[in-house]
Design a protein with these regions (language model features):
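Subset of outer-membrane beta-barrel
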Residues: 1-296
């Protein structure tokens, strides 16, 4: 289920209700269509710390008038070291290093003035390495692949509303040792909308407010989970965000309230977020997210 770990401080702070959001390499992990109208090159690092582990996603985005928007990304998740000990004495003689890696290549393009489309191909790898005296410790390296696809559409009404649909983690079962031990990928279907509250701009100059609402579930969409988020910005410089994930999907994802802040300084965008899910917060260690983007 490491493919479901949320990536990106902005996305987390908005309650992960981001399927209709545009701009920023976080869209690689949510809806690749959100990259379609990017106008500047971007290098970004998205860092996370949670009870699951510590992870970093690095992305490079390149917009081309002729080809569309191309993005390459790597996500690395370290779920913690485990000691190898001598039976009976407990003396540590080695260290087990379990890790997850995802390599992603994304293509996105606008279609006319109202439609965005995007596709991501991902190669996921689970590795268990060992250092030191590792006799009897299994060394594992398993690789699988998946596809994410999404579209966004600007509704032709006076209000600025975008809707989005994305399917993530489509692909064959992830095989660890043999076919009997393979697991199906956590495929998700997410639909939602974002609305820019333009009437507030006339009341508070320089203030922009955007609200998002999404639903997400497995492909059967029998019991979708709702997600909401709001983004308040002042002169495109300072941002306050909040969101809520109402329930988990099949016990696989974190849920609860989230908050975040963002600052823009020239070409640099800094975003921070915290997710107050019941389990991690109960242990006094809510997941923390930090994103740094450089646009040029």
């Amino acid at each position: 289920m490491f493919l479901l770990i949320p990536i990106g401080a902005k996305s987390v702070s908005l309650g992960q209700a981001v399927v209709a959001e545009q701009g920023g390499t976080e869209a690689v992990w949510w809806n690749p269509a959100g990259l379609a109208r990017a106008e500047k090159k971007e290098i970004a690092v998205h860092h996370l710390e949670s009870i699951v582990g510590t992870g970093d996603a690095v992305s490079f985005l390149y917009p081309s008038d002729a080809l569309g928007v191309l993005t390459g990304s790597i996500f690395y998740l370290d779920i913690g070291e485990q000691p190898v000990t001598v039976p009976g004495t407990g003396t540590q003689v080695g260290t087990i290093l379990p890790r997850f890696l995802v390599f992603a290549a994304t293509y996105a393009t606008p279609i006319g003035s109202r439609v965005n489309a995007g596709l991501t191909y991902k190669v996921a790898q689970f590795r268990v390495d060992c250092t030191g005296f590792c006799t009897g410790v299994p060394i594992i390296s398993s690789t699988g692949s998946a596809i994410d696809a999404g579209v966004q559409y600007s509704i032709p009404i006076p209000a600025p509303v975008w809707v989005g649909v994305a399917v993530r983690n489509l692909g064959p079962k992830f095989q660890v040792k043999d076919s009997e031990q393979s697991d199906p990928l956590p495929t998700r279907l997410q639909v939602g909308a974002t609305y820019e509250v333009t009437p507030l701009q006339r009341l508070a100059r320089g203030v922009d407010v955007r609200v998002n609402a999404d639903f997400i579930d497995e492909l059967n969409f029998e019991s979708p989970s709702a997600r909401i988020g709001a983004d308040i910005s002042y002169r495109k410089f300072a941002y306050f965000r909040a969101g809520y994930v109402f329930k988990e999907v099949e016990g696989s994802e974190q849920y609860g309230p989230s908050i975040g802040l963002g600052l823009t300084a020239g070409r640099v965008q800094l975003d921070m977020a915290r997710l107050f899910d019941e389990f991690s917060s109960g242990l006094g260690d809510p997941p923390t997210y930090l994103s740094v983007r450089y646009l040029f």
